[in-house]
């Protein structure tokens, strides 16, 4: 495994820590140019067949890389990704995060979910280096927007597929400042801009089909949400022994239909 660490103008002792492992890793130090620039620097330096982006404060399991590579070899022209766990600043597990499993969908159906804002945690992905020759990371201020722009462009403009590994392979560390209203609002603005940019690059008849199907999908989602909200409100008005039985009944039905 080739490990490339980009020190993008750090002001703490990060570079010193990296240099203590200099016999095992490749270190590149540059002035602060932002996340996309650091990614491009690392990608240009890499010599292997697979690219794995990994943030400095997240955690992998000993089997993460092997699991990703084994699965990626089964699916050509495909970015593989996995479920993950959320941990806090101290490493305490907050919750497991299970991605929606769209493996049975066609590429077109999956792309509709991406257009609707479906997010993929880039830290869980493994990307063949050949795919990075088709599609690259664009310079944006928002790290989430960089991920989303790359995945949406890969799918709609480069014809790349996606495949979920149901196993949790990453511990993703979340910081309190990431949850601020300002950051979330900024990301949503970026996502809207990205969707419009990608759609405008498509042929008119393909773009019109995507827009039509996206509206239909969002309408269906809205109906399901309203039905669920009504059901939850109804359950809240019934005695607990009744609502518990109803929930158990429907959970069993869901399991049977999987």
Would you name each region that the model predicts?
Residues 103-186:
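Conserved nucleotide-sugar donor-binding catalytic segment
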Residues 11-20, 59, 63:
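Acidic helix N-cap motif at the loop->helix transition within catalytic regions
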Residues 63-95:
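Conserved donor NDP-sugar-binding/catalytic core segment of glycosyltransferases
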Residues 55-59, 83:
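The conserved acidic donor/metal-binding loop of glycosyltransferases
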Residues 30-46:
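Glycine-rich, basic loop-to-helix element that forms the pyrophosphate-binding segment
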Residues 51:
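Short aromatic/hydrophobic "clamp" motif used to bind/position activated sugar donors
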Residues 7-16, 33, 55:
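A conserved acidic beta->alpha catalytic loop
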Residues 1-4, 13, 23-26:
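Short loop->beta transition adjacent to catalytic acidic/histidine clusters or analogous donor-positioning motifs
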């Amino acid at each position: 495994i080739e490990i490339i660490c980009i020190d993008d103008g750090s002001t703490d002792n990060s570079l010193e820590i990296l240099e203590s492992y200099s016999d095992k890793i490749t270190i590149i130090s540059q002035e602060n140019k932002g996340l996309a620039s650091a990614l491009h620097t690392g990608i240009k330096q890499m010599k292997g067949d697979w690219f794995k982006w990994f943030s400095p404060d997240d955690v992998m399991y000993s089997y993460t890389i092997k699991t990703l590579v084994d699965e990626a070899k089964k699916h050509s022209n495909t970015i593989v990704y996995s479920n993950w766990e959320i941990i806090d600043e101290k490493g305490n597990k907050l919750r497991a995060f299970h991605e929606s499993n769209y493996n049975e969908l066609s590429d077109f159906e999956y792309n509709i979910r991406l257009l609707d804002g479906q997010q993929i945690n880039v830290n869980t992905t493994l990307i063949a280096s050949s795919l990075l020759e088709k599609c690259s990371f664009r310079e944006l201020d928002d790290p989430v927007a960089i991920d989303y722009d790359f995945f949406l462009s890969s799918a709609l403009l480069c014809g790349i597929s996606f495949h979920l590994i149901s196993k949790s392979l990453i511990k993703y560390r979340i910081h309190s400042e990431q949850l601020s209203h300002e950051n979330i609002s900024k990301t949503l603005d970026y996502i809207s801009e990205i969707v419009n940019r990608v759609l405008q690059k498509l042929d008119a008849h393909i773009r019109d089909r995507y827009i039509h199907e996206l509206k239909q999908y969002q309408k269906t989602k809205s109906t399901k949400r309203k039905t669920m909200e009504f059901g939850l409100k109804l359950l809240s008005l019934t005695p607990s022994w009744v609502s518990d039985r109803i929930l158990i009944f429907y959970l069993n039905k869901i399991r049977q239909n999987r």
